[in-house]
UniProtKB/Swiss-Prot annotation:
Keywords (A to Z) from UniProt: Cell membrane, Membrane, Transmembrane, Transmembrane helix
Name of the protein described by the UniProt record: UPF0391 membrane protein bsl5717
High-level lineage: Bacteria, Pseudomonadati, Pseudomonadota, Alphaproteobacteria, Hyphomicrobiales
Coiled-coil regions listed in the entry: none
Main location: membrane
GO CC list: plasma membrane
Length: 57
């Protein structure tokens, strides 16, 4: 859950920076948020597949 929380924090930083006119910082933090979200999704899917197949009791 920590990766998702950091992705949301970077998303909020991106929105605030965009509203204040810092477009470079906004784009960079949006890219970081997108990357962290994709990492979260990949980890979630891997653990879901492992839970449904290998670790079935």
């Amino acid at each position: 859950m920590t990766i998702l929380k950091w992705a949301l924090i970077f998303l909020l930083v991106s929105i605030v920076a965009g509203v204040l006119g810092f477009t470079g910082i906004s784009a960079a933090s949006a890219d970081i948020a997108r990357f962290l979200f994709y990492v979260f999704v990949v980890i979630f899917l891997v653990l879901l597949i492992l839970g449904l197949t290998i670790f079935r009791a």
